[in-house]
């Protein structure tokens, strides 16, 4: 019998090499936990980065709003004046049309 066949038989008959070690399920669980932990840390990092970016953007928006505050108020006042002017013009036009209609119906 060749020597290598003897070593193969010896290896196969030894129980510790033939059957999976009892720590294999533990290793698989640890591997799965490591994958989960790694993915979870990535997600937490992305959430933190997103929150930081939103905070920075809201601060910048707040600064812009403070700078634009007087301009916005002035714009609203101008819009209000135009609306009042338009309403007065429409009321004048409507009054003129009513007068013309009453003259036409009388005559």
From Swiss-Prot:
PROSITE patterns per UniProt: GLUCAGON
Name of the protein: Somatoliberin
GO biological process annotation, one example: regulation of protein localization
Keyword set, alphabetical order: Amidation, Cleavage on pair of basic residues, Secreted, Signal
Sites bearing Leucine amide, chain numbering: 74
Species of provenance: Mesocricetus auratus (Golden hamster)
InterPro entries membership: Glucagon_GIP_secretin_VIP, VIP/GHRH-like
Compartment(s) where it occurs, according to its Swiss-Prot or TrEMBL record: Secreted
PANTHER family with a match to the protein in the record: GLUCAGON-FAMILY NEUROPEPTIDE (PTHR11213), SOMATOLIBERIN (PTHR11213:SF6)
Function: GRF is released by the hypothalamus and acts on the adenohypophyse to stimulate the secretion of growth hormone.
Recorded family membership: Belongs to the glucagon family.
């Amino acid at each position: 019998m060749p020597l290598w066949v003897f070593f193969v038989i010896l290896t196969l008959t030894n129980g510790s090499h033939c059957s999976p070690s009892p720590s294999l399920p533990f290793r698989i669980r640890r591997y799965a936990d490591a994958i989960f932990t790694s993915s979870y840390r990535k997600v937490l990092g992305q959430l933190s980065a997103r929150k930081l970016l939103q905070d920075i953007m809201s601060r910048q928006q707040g600064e812009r709003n403070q700078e634009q505050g007087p301009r916005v108020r002035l714009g609203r006042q101008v819009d209000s004046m135009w609306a009042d002017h338009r309403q007065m013009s429409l009321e004048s036009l409507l009054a003129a049309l009513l007068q013309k209609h009453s003259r036409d119906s009388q005559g």
